[in-house]
């Protein structure tokens, strides 16, 4: 995918990039490749692949969810800034918090935000299980996003506690989502969520199937969730 094709496919979905936004994506690509040489951020570094499998993929939730109607967003397991940074570039009004357990990635994200001139980007070091119990973050966000971090029952425990009641959780998942949805049904309900819709589509250039799972937070998450760090992975809710 060329930079021009990237801009065209977004415009076809109603997201028209300004010259400044196009420059921000180009700068982000260069920073990603540069920093990837000293820390493991991504296995994808070829420009066309980055634009398709990282940038475009990160923005696809906006084809199905109204990002212009939310203010506060948290990206759980945001690592190299996906989906948070592409979404922030496209929707500059967002107040974006990025939580990741690797501190060195926080340095990268802080540098990216500064270099790209992105305001209201807050990288936070920590595990979702810990931060999700803290009053500063718990049930404070209009929207929670996460990209292929874990299976949906586990991911829901990491993410739903951060959403306000009436807010949403959007999970960016790969192929074969039906078994995960069935497996996660009880967990989602227990955590106060309800699956509203699932959108299935193909990434461009035969890069594979993707699924966007959109949940609404309809009840407060019980105080016992998320459980202590490491417990959800060992004993997933089923």
Curated annotation (Swiss-Prot):
Catalytic activity, EC: 2.1.1.-
Binding site residues for S-adenosyl-L-methionine: 77, 82, 128-129, 147
One MF term in the entry's GO annotations: rRNA (guanine-N7-)-methyltransferase activity
UniProt keyword annotation of ATP-binding present: no
Coiled coil: none
Keyword Chloroplast: no
InterPro entries, per the entry: rRNA_ssu_MeTfrase_G, SAM-dependent_MTases_sf
NCBIfam families: rsmG_gidB (TIGR00138)
Protein name: Ribosomal RNA small subunit methyltransferase G
Organism, as annotated: Brevibacillus brevis (strain 47 / JCM 6285 / NBRC 100599)
């Amino acid at each position: 995918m060329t930079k021009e094709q990237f801009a065209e496919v977004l415009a076809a979905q109603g997201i028209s990039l300004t010259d400044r936004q196009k420059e921000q994506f180009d700068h982000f690509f260069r920073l990603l490749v540069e920093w990837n040489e000293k820390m493991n951020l991504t296995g994808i570094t070829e420009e066309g692949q980055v634009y398709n499998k990282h940038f475009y993929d990160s923005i696809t939730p906006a084809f199905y969810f109204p990002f212009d109607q939310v203010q506060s967003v948290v990206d759980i397991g945001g690592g190299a800034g996906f989906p948070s940074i592409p979404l922030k570039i496209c929707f500059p009004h967002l107040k974006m918090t990025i939580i990741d357990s690797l501190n060195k990635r926080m340095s990268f994200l802080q540098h990216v935000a500064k270099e790209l001139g992105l305001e209201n980007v807050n990288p936070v070091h920590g595990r979702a299980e810990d931060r999700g119990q803290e009053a500063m973050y718990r049930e404070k966000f209009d929207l929670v996003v996460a990209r292929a971090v874990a299976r949906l029952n586990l991911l829901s425990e990491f993410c739903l506690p951060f959403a306000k009641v009436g807010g949403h959780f959007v999970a960016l998942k790969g192929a074969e989502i039906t078994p995960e949805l069935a497996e996660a049904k009880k967990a989602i309900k227990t955590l106060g969520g309800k699956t509203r819709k699932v959108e299935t589509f193909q990434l461009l250039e035969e890069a594979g199937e993707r699924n966007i799972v959109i949940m609404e937070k309809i009840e407060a998450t019980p105080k016992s969730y998320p459980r202590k760090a490491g417990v959800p992975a060992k004993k997933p809710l089923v």
